[in-house]
Amino acid sequence: MQREYDYIIIGAGSAGNVLAARLTEDPGVSVLLLEAGGPDYRLDFRTQMPAALAFPLQGRRYNWAYETEPEPHMDNRRMECGRGKGLGGSSLINGMCYIRGNALDFDHWAKRPGLEDWGYRDVLPYFRKAETRDIGANDYHGGEGPVSVATPKNDNNVLFQAMVDAGVQAGYPRTDDLNGYQQEGFGPMDRTVTPQGRRASTARGYLDMAKPRDSLHIVTHATTDRILFAGKRAVGVHYLVGNSSEGIDAHARREVLVCAGAIASPQLLQRSGVGAPDLLRALDVQLVHDLPGVGQNLQDHLEVYMQYACTKPVSLYPALQWWNQPAIGAEWLFAGTGTGASNQFEAGGFIRTREEFDWPNIQYHFLPVAINYNGSNAVKEHGFQAHVGSMRTPSRGRVHARSRDPRQHPSILFNYQSTDQDWQEFRDAIRITREIIAQPALDPYRGREISPSADCKTDAELDAFVRARAETAYHPSCSCAMGTDDMAVVDGQGRVHGMEGLRVIDASIMPRIITGNLNATTIMIAEKIVDRIRGRAPLPRSTADYYVAGDAPVRR
């Protein structure tokens, strides 16, 4: 087997697959793509059927199933931190919500020294390059990219439109495209689903395009033990296949590209000798480079589920009954349509809770059934729910490798809800949600409040509910942040500071978490940086307009 390549990519996820496909477009460029998980089996409904999105989170085949340390502000709960394992990474198990973030997220990135070319108009062309939207291209959307994006259709569940209308009746804006001119407001939510009703992971979009090339070598069940260095230059990797303890060395002529995600990328750097000296000393790892920001600045989105009974039999509750599932599965399998072909997050919104926020600080996902995201605790009646959570928490956490063993999970602490702002935002969010649900648009459907329940009212009661019941939105990020400050890990091209031939390219390099789901932005980051790796000129900046709230009131 060939053991020398131009590039070695660690992690076949949302970013790694983009790099593998784009780098091998160039003749004569060889790539080794290492993935610790297995293939993305196309006949496994658990990952391929959009409506089955809870299933991969319940097992270990496709999910690393990390857990946090006891979270001190969350009743010391050990909280889930699911991450994708297998070709596609977290795009193989995520909720398929296609949300890019707010334009001002990127404009604020670009205000940081060294990140001047990460403004919204710089990144929008790369969002478009990656996308094929089912209703065609425009100034904001692409029509020729590897990622299939489906838009909600008029014949979907009546509760979606009712919830959007209720948000507008409560005084918030309506938007026809959460990824278009104006993110702020309520409207339909796009999803990464193919025209055939299948999950559009990066394995399907990018790897399918690249697999026929002889220059791409993919190894699954390959756990990267450590990066190999000659001085300060990354020259290869040492990896293990399956349960073997016998490692394999592979050498990179040009670069090693770390795309293992916001949990595993910093863990790998630390195990390889790049990180804070005190931590490496405790792990008995020889210091290659002192970089204290590795694993710091960890951020996530937290959310609560506001659940309501539905007084009409229009929710998806019947789809949870086993006797209805064969028909749903058959329609999806043979026609690619029906309940199974949607992730059921077809409406949502972004709002500002207070005038002090320049762009939305709260996100909504609407779901026409009352159930936990991971499929647990389904309410045994017709119901619906709003997932609501804050977007740019000031709380910061960290990821630390526990040992040199690549198969041991790292120590993860998000430090959720560690600031006063966190608590104020969740109190506001719960109270605003109740105002929205009380609007006339939901009069035909609204039953009692199931969770947290109508008698949960005071600040103390709401805080107790958040501590006991809030869950991750599965958006870990920022643990190898881009920038030039002392705690930055990479520059604006993903190059690890102080090193040669080594980049990190995934959600970990976001300097600050974005307003929304992370998958689309992670793909964009990879598309943008791979142009630089290939020596290509950046795509021309967009000239598209975008909404800035300015002095506009939070609600009418």
UniProtKB/Swiss-Prot annotation:
The active site is at 475 (proton acceptor). This is Oxygen-dependent choline dehydrogenase. The keyword NAD applies. Pathway: Amine and polyamine biosynthesis; betaine biosynthesis via choline pathway; betaine aldehyde from choline (cytochrome c reductase route): step 1/1. Keywords: FAD, Flavoprotein, NAD, Oxidoreductase. It comes from Xanthomonas campestris pv. campestris (strain ATCC 33913 / DSM 3586 / NCPPB 528 / LMG 568 / P 25). Its EC number is 1.1.99.1, 1.2.1.8. It comes from the Bacteria. GO terms for biological process: glycine betaine biosynthetic process from choline. Pfam families: GMC_oxred_C, GMC_oxred_N. FAD binds at residues 6-35. Transmembrane segments: none annotated. PROSITE patterns: GMC_OXRED_1, GMC_OXRED_2. Belongs to the GMC oxidoreductase family. The keyword Transferase does not apply. Its cofactor is FAD. It catalyses: choline + A = betaine aldehyde + AH2; betaine aldehyde + NAD(+) + H2O = glycine betaine + NADH + 2 H(+). GO terms for molecular function: betaine-aldehyde dehydrogenase (NAD+) activity; choline dehydrogenase activity; flavin adenine dinucleotide binding.
